[in-house]
């Protein structure tokens, strides 16, 4: 299983696209969200927020929810 660290940044859409491609390719993934990377300090939540292992339909729902979120 791959563990993907998704960093909140200006390139969020690229990170989520990587997740989508890996899931569509049949990879099992564990998504870990981390804080903003644009800081000189360690990102907020630098340990990441481990998400449970997601089925494809659950990941699609998570992605749709994240895309609606204006700020985290």
Q: Where do the protein language model's features map onto the residues?
A:
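N-terminal beta-loop-helix "entrance" segment that forms/cooperates
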Residues: 36-51
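An anion/phosphate-binding loop that grips the pyrophosphate of nucleotide cofactors and donors
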Residues: 66
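Short, glycine-rich nucleotide/cofactor-binding loops
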Residues: 2-16
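A short, Lys/Arg-enriched amphipathic alpha-helix followed by its capping loop at the start of a domain
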Residues: 18-27
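Glycine-rich, highly charged phosphate/nucleotide-binding loops
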Residues: 47-63
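Short, charged, surface-exposed secondary-structure boundary motifs
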Residues: 15, 40-42, 57-60
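Short internal beta-strands
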Residues: 27-37
